[in-house]
Amino acid sequence: MSAAEAQRAVGILVVIAPADGAEKVSPAQVVAGLPLVQRIALAGKAAGYAEGLVGDRPEQIPARVVLLPRNVVPQPAWLRSLLEGALERDCLVVDSSMTMVVETADPSLVIKAAARAPSAAALHEELRARYAQGPWPFETSGRFVLTATEDVRRAETWLLRSLIKQREGFMSRHFERRISLGLTRRLVRTSITPNAMTAVSAAIGLAGAPFFLSSEPRWQLAGALLFLTHSILDGCDGEIARLKFLSSRRGAILDFWGDNLVHVAVFACIGIGTTWATASFWPLAAAAVAVVSTVASAAVMFRRTVDDRASAGSTSSARLLDALASRDFIYLLLVLSAFGKAAWFLVATAFGTPAFLALALWLDYRHGRVR
């Protein structure tokens, strides 16, 4: 069966008994804030599998049945690949975790076999007698196999590392993410929601902006540290949402515009504070340029950022745009603020944000949309 035909097949995800040796892993075992069986069900839903089983499913509708041992922690993208990848009709494939996939015109036979089989091995034997077995054609990197409860922490680490986005800056990837992922590991065990974390992060960032009204290094540094704290905590909302399957477009929009509101507030306060300190007009003009360019850039970049997509094409310009969109600039502000020179950062921003906007618009023109 071709990949296109596979996409038209109904996907059915069935949780089965674990492979021999993993029986002690309870289906109620909590992994990153969710019971294991609930995590599997939500991952299947996110991957596009049917939410329920219909007893009188018409036989002419093909179905791809994925039989997943309950000790396997799956990524939605991996489950989606099992659903959409090419697979011959009535061919059984099995991986080392005893995950089984079969494409069939009568899925009820497979489902009934799974219901009565006492173990994954017994189910495998029964299905192998009915279907020809072929080699496993899919990747295995998208799932983590629990063999004992001691594996839970490693499984959580594996899940957390998968949350790093495509467009991470160097400092974000190697410093901020380490902190935010450590916080998220603990936060997912609580009832805090992604939107609540977005509000906390934005509040801290906005609280830091007024410190830049002063020209004193100590106050500017305090503001920069709060700005950095905002940036670190800003990663937690999306991490919680993806780990607990709470992602929503509304939440992504709130996060995106909350970030940009903080940036606008910081740039504006630097401009106002520098104007007070120097009795000059140019800081306000520079801040106005930075604010307008930031808002315009946000409008251009909105869809790609909210959907976490790479820039269209693979040109050096597209890669440069992704690099400039990162928030590593915060560390420059941190250093300059330690010496009371936040105004220097404002000057750089007044030149940099229009250049970023021009590059985004140029790529938008060349590729239709920057996505």
Where are these regions (language model features)?
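Conserved donor-nucleotide/metal-binding helix-loop-beta segment in metal-dependent transferases, i.e.
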Residues: 73-98, 264, 271-274
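A feature for the membrane-embedded catalytic helix bundles of lipid/isoprenoid biosynthetic enzymes
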Residues: 98-181, 256-371
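N-terminal glycine-rich phosphate-binding loop and ensuing alpha1 helix
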Residues: 2-56
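Alpha-helical transmembrane segments of multipass membrane proteins
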Residues: 186, 206-210, 332-335
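Membrane-embedded alpha-helical segments that form the functional core of polytopic membrane enzymes
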Residues: 194-250
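Short beta-strand-to-loop acidic/aromatic patch adjacent to the donor-nucleotide binding site
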Residues: 59-73
